[in-house]
């Protein structure tokens, strides 16, 4: 076991990664596994520049951090929740799911409350929008400022990525 672990430190944690590190050392073109490693690094926020150098120890260090983070996520959710997007949305929709011990005591009332909370979430969201609209209507003295900011928001609606360049023009006109 110890000799296998030492060889894994030199070549990476998997057989496929060992072949890609050897190819990277000899300068041959990269294969799918190295691209997958780069995309995993980008997804988990790891160092993108470390695996590109092609050193076995660096790739193992980056791979170890990814391998360490994947089982934690899969243990946290159900076995079918390996998709991070599904995991993210399930946490948003029902963030207050009770632990199984609490659910046994008063399961019906808790499930009713959780469904009620999910049903009322769009209502709360629309209520916030109504509050914002009523706040703009309440400031009748600064009616033109409110219109200016609303027109800026509607003009920005298309781009959204460059707020600095577009938002400067309505201010200059005023």
Curated annotation (Swiss-Prot):
Tell me the segments the record calls region Disordered.
1-86, 126-174
Q: Which residues carry this modification: Deamidated asparagine?
A: 91
Q: Which residues carry this modification: Symmetric dimethylarginine?
A: 106
Main localization category = membrane
Q: Where is the composition biased (Basic and acidic residues)?
A: 22-35, 45-61
Question: What membrane topology does this protein have?
Answer: Peripheral membrane protein
Q: Which GO terms describe its cellular component?
A: myelin sheath; plasma membrane
> Is this entry keyworded Phosphoprotein?
yes
Which positions does the record annotate as the modified residue Phosphoserine? 8, 19, 34, 65, 74, 114, 142, 165, 169
Keyword annotations of the record? Acetylation, Cell membrane, Citrullination, Membrane, Methylation, Phosphoprotein
InterPro entries named in the record: Myelin_BP
- How does it get modified post-translation? Several charge isomers are produced as a result of optional post-translational modifications, such as phosphorylation of serine or threonine residues, deamidation of glutamine or asparagine residues, citrullination and methylation of arginine residues. Chicken MBP contains 4 charge components denoted as C1, C2, C3 and C8. C1 lacks any phosphorylation sites, whereas C2 and C3 contain respectively 10 and 8 phosphorylation sites and arginine residues modified to citrulline. All three charge components contain deamidated glutamines and asparagine, and a methylated arginine.
Q: Which residues carry this modification: Omega-N-methylarginine?
A: 106
Transmembrane: is it a keyword of this entry?
no
Give all Phosphothreonine modified positions: 97
Where found? Answer: Myelin membrane
Q: Which residues carry this modification: N-acetylalanine?
A: 2
| Residues found modified as Citrulline | 25, 42, 166
- Low complexity bias spans: 162-174
Highest taxon, organism lineage: Eukaryota
Any one GO MF term held by the record is: structural constituent of myelin sheath
Positions carrying Deamidated glutamine are: 4, 72, 102, 147
How does this protein assemble?
Homodimer.
UniProt similarity note: Belongs to the myelin basic protein family.
Q: What does this protein do?
A: Is, with PLP, the most abundant protein component of the myelin membrane in the CNS. Has a role in both the formation and stabilization of this compact multilayer arrangement of bilayers. Each splice variant and charge isomer may have a specialized function in the assembly of an optimized, biochemically functional myelin membrane.
Q: Could you tell me what this protein is called?
A: Myelin basic protein
Q: Which organism is it from?
A: Gallus gallus
**Taxonomic lineage of the native organism:** Eukaryota, Metazoa, Chordata, Craniata, Vertebrata
């Amino acid at each position: 076991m110890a000799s296998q672990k030492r060889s894994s430190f030199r070549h990476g944690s998997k057989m496929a990664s060992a072949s890609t590190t050897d190819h990277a050392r000899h300068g041959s073109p990269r294969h799918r596994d190295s691209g997958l490693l780069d995309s995993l690094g980008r997804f988990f926020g790891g160092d993108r520049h470390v695996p590109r150098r092609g050193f076995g120890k660096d790739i193992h260090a980056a791979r170890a951090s990814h391998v360490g983070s994947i089982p934690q996520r899969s243990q946290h959710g159900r076995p079918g929740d390996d998709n991070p997007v599904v995991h993210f949305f399930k946490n948003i929709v029902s963030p207050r799911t009770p632990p199984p011990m609490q659910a046994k005591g008063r399961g019906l009332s808790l499930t009713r409350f959780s469904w009620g909370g999910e049903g009322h979430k769009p209502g709360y969201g629309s209520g916030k929008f109504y509050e914002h609209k009523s706040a703009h209507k309440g400031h009748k003295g600064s009616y033109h400022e409110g219109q200016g900011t609303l027109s800026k928001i509607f003009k920005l609606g298309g781009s959204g990525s460059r707020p600095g360049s577009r938002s400067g023009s309505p201010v200059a006109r005023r």
